[in-house]
Amino acid sequence: DVREYVGHHDVVSGLVQGGADPQDEVWVLAHSAEPGAMDNASGVSICLEMARILEGLIADGKIKRPRRTIRFLNAYECYGFFHYMEHVKRLQMPLAGVCLDTLGAKPSVCDGRLTWRSTIPMSAGFVDRIGEYMLQATLALENPGYTLHTGPFVPTSDTLAGDPKYGFPCPWLSTHYRDEGVFDAYHSSGDTADEILSPE
C-alpha cells in the first residue's frame, strides 16, 4: 500500500564563524536523506566532526579562527541545497564549496581509491587544484591505505551547485568508486557501518 502526501525535508546549517571576513563563506555540503552508512551518513558525520574539531582547536588556542566563515549544510540531495540557495537571503554567494558524498570506505571496499572530482567546467577551476594539493599533503602525513585519484566533473546532483546559476565551484570528494565501477553496496541495505574505516 502506497499513499502520496506532501512532506518536507530539513536543511541543517552550522557555522565555524570567520574572524576577519565572516561575510565570505566556504560551504561544505553533505546530503542527508539517503539511509546508507557511507551514502551518506559518512558525509554528515564528517561535517559534524570537522566543526567540532575546528571549534575545539580554536577554543584551546591551538589555531586561529579561519579568516572566512565555513558553513556546513546537510539537506535532501540536490533539491534541499538548491532551495536553500534560491530562498535564503545573503549578501553574496559562497566563494567555494566541497561536496562530501560517500566517504570513509575501508580501502578493501573502495580498492584504496580516494576520489577528487573536479567542479563543473565553467566554474573556477583553481579550487580543484587547491583541493588536490591539500589532499596529497594530508595523505603524505598519514595514510590508512588510500591513493588519490583525480577526475573530471561528474554530475551527482549536489555537484551541480557549481553551475553559474548559483555561482560557486564545488568539487566532489568520495570513496564511491572502485577500480571497476562503484562500491558493492551502493544504494542497498548492504551499505552498513562495518564497511567504514574505524577512526582508531
For each feature predicted by the language model, list its residue ranges.
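Metal-dependent peptidase/peptidase-like ectodomains
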Residues: D1, A75-H176, G181-V182, D194-E195
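Soluble metallo-hydrolase cores and metallopeptidase-like ectodomains found primarily
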Residues: D1-A41, L48-K62, T69
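Short, solvent-exposed loop/turn and secondary-structure capping segments
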Residues: E25, M38-S42, H83-M85, V109-C110
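Short helix-loop-beta-strand segments that form the rim/entrance of peptidase-like active sites
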Residues: I53-Y84, R90-Q92
